UniProtKB/Swiss-Prot annotation:
Source species, domain of life: Eukaryota
Coiled coil: 138-450
Protein name (Swiss-Prot/TrEMBL): Caspase recruitment domain-containing protein 10
Known function: Scaffold protein that plays an important role in mediating the activation of NF-kappa-B via BCL10 or EGFR.
Gene3D superfamilies: Death Domain, Fas, P-loop containing nucleotide triphosphate hydrolases, SH3 Domains
Keyword Transit peptide attributed: no
Bias (Basic and acidic residues) ranges: 495-508, 525-535
PROSITE patterns noted in UniProt: CARD (PS50209)
Tissue: Highly expressed in kidney, heart followed by brain, lung, liver, skeletal muscle and testis.
CARD domain mapped to chain residues: 23-115
Keywords from the UniProt entry: Coiled coil, Phosphoprotein
Amino acid sequence: MQGRADAGEADEEAGAGSGSEAEEDALWERIEGVRHRLTRALNPAKLTPYLRQCRVLDEQDEEEVLSTYRFPCRANRTGRLIDILRCRGKRGFEAFLEALEFYYPEHFTLLTGQEPAQRCSMILDEEGPEGLTQFLMTEVRRLREARKSQLHREQQLQARGRALEEERAGLEQRLREQQQAQERCQRLREDWEAGSLELLRLKDENYMIAMRLAQLSEEKNSAVLRSRDLQLAVDQLKLKVSRLEEECALLRRARGPPPGAEEKEREPDGADLLSELRAENQRLTASLQELQEGLQQEMSRPGAAGSERILLDILEHDWREAQDSRQELCQKLHAVQGELQWAEELRDKYLQEMEDLRLKHRTLLKDCDLYKHRMATVLAQLEEIEKERDQAIQSRDRIQLQYSQSLIEKDQYRKQVRGLEAERDELLTTVTSLEGTKAMLEAQLQRTQGGSCLKACASSHSLCSNLSSTWSLSEFPSPLGGPEATGEAGGSEPHTSEEATDSEKEINRLSILPFPPSAGSILRRQREEDPEPPKRSFSSMSDITGSVTLKPWSPGLSSSSSSDSVWPLGKPEGLLARGCGLDFLNRSLAIRVSGWSPPAGLDPQDKSPDSMPGLGDRWSGAVVRRVLSGPGSARTEQKEPRAEGTGLEGAGLEAEAQQRTLPWNQSSTLPFLLDSKACHSFHEALDAWAKGPGAEPFYIRANFSLPERSDPHALCVKAQEILRLVDPAHKRRQEWFCTRVDTLTLRDLDRGTVPNYQRAQQLLEVQEKYLISSRHRSPRSNLKKRALGLVRPKPAGGTAGDSAEQLPAEPCSELERSLKPYSLVRPLLVSALRPVVLLPECLAPRLIRNLLDLPSSRLDFQVCPAESLSGEEQCTSSAPGAPKAWPATAGLGSRIRAIQESVGKKHCLLELGARGVRELVHSEVYPIVIHVEVTEKNVREIRGLLGRPGWRDSELLRQCRGSEQWLWGLPCSWVQVPAHAWGHAEELAKVVRGRILQEQARLVWVERGSSRGGSGSSSEA
């Protein structure tokens, strides 16, 4: 095979007389002439493998062409490849043309003017026979595949040819049938043409006859007219002749001799006149003669009578034809008159039908409009039904989730109950071992001291037995009211039996005290038992009920007994040595009493300093708890009992008792104890309302969704619902009798019982603890904690520095520390236009712009830049339960006054947060708070609305939900736009505008004491 390029062969065949270098330069010039086309069309990554195989490019050149940053686009890389090949000389040119011949044959034809032959000269020179053999095998495989595809195509074409042959046979048969039909059609066409020619001939003959008849009729008419003219002329001549004769006669008669000179003068004139008359008479005579001669000649002609007869026949024929045509015209006229009458009847009929159709058309149009309106109404109702269905599905899913959570909680409670039973059994075992120890001590004391010490040990043994047999779990502390709060010390028999029944119900079925063991069994157990028994605690017990209650097993155990009476010989050292004394004494024991007066047989001065007398109240359902002192426990101070129990004292005692029932080394304290001021103000308002029965309704707002209860009369209270208090001491239990109030019309919806303030706090605290513990147990607890911003409060004994560092950590920590189940609210009807606050804060600027872009929105809204009021950062008080201080800044009052001045004109769109809303309400400005719900379903639309594609969905959700935590602490009502109420940004702006207009006409519920006084533009509803 030859090793030169195809371009050189083409030039040699063309017979160009220049040398190889001139030819090469000429071809490179041709390549440079179409360089722009080559750089745009060629792919260097496709050409470099073949050029590397031809050894005109090395690895460095390939890397420079394909991987360098100097040539960002493909055109630059192709140009650099052409420059490198031109530097390689003739070999580069030949390899470039062969590559074009293989991969770009159209550009090879453009450069050389030849069709690509795909020869392999360069491969043979560079790679040798092996490379060529491999290349040829590749080509053979390609040709075989092409041959197979060609054979397959031939088979397809043959099958198609057979189908076409069958189709051709069918078409030939149809062609023969069409030819026969065409022959028949040709014969019919010839017959038709012959008949047409005969018809034309007959029409021509008829036309000639008609023309002849018309000519004869014209000749007849002209002859008749001529005869009439001649007859008229004859008559005129005759008349003229007779007139002239009469004149001549008169002239002759009047002729006489001329009278003198006048007659002589008139004689020439008369002679002239006479000559003229004579000449005229001669002329007339001559003309008459000529006429007579012509008449005679006419009369004397032989064919005159026949022509007149012919003319008469023609005239008669014409008359008859005229009669016939007249008759036909009359008939046609009659027919036309009948058709006209029929057409008029049809016109009247059609006009009547047109009027009926018009009436039907109008009726149908009205029916169509009615049906359109009905369809629009039905579609709107369907949309509402779909929304209600979605809401029902969501509520069903939520209820199912709550039910599953309740099942999980039930399982957790069962596990805790089993753990507590195990702990109780271990405690009973410990008490039994203590009893064995005491029995040993009794035996030793009996041998050494005698019977007196034995009696003391026996009394101690009986007291410990009573104490060990009366441990029980109290889920709900019973309220003190009526006979329990005001009864005598001893109590009545029905009350005692009822309390005993309650005690029997609350005693666990396994808490049965075994009989005291003998001395031998005690010694044997001491040898067999481990000297260090396991330590257990009641920490889980407080998580379930919030308190551990010790109820009296016998009437002999007094509620005012001191801790010294429990241990008459002092605290035994053996109990502390066995490892369970400290853990046991660190637990507080709450003893339920039947009255606040001391029982009979004991004087008030016999009370120990550790006892804590108190009084419950009927509002909170608090009971008096007695705290047993021990190592590590705080000493309670003596409180002076008041004459009448108030809600504040009962709440304080209940809170203190609840706090002391918790372990002191636990990592969290009760959050509701830190908001004593809110509890104090709430109970003061409740007492004031109870003392005045004719006062205004007592409205409260549920700040949280309370857990559902098994009581059939209990109300299922959701967050932000308004309740009206009816009976604060319903059946003397820890619950209120309330009615759910419609927030728009103030009408009562349904009635039932709800937990009172302290009971609701306990339920919320237990629920919060369970949620926190479930978050800690889940593998993603830290991630959820960061996403939801939950921060546990520090222990009560922690340092001030630690608490100060942790309190401002997350925005919801303040809400957790002020766990208020209810808030005292009042309805207000604001007549002036209220300002608008949009939440979350990151959506407020964009939503404000979209609201202002809506048509006619600038007539209702305006932007009031409040500069975030600079006072919304509230000062955090040092004490956890202390009230928050409002910062007094110089510019705050002026900005609020600016907002108040613009309230009466338009709705002010404010870019404020939840804390700014507190300042506005404090300044007697009640804004409309609109919160847009952000969920995983609409977070992408929210991100597109903000125009920040770089944000992650989790970051946006965390920011929006962080602002959502502040909503539950607002002192006024707010409205939320759910995620299913809108689909895109424009619809969101319309929905927000509609909610603003709706909220303007509604009542606003404001917390009592949140503002300085009643506003001038608002009134009590």
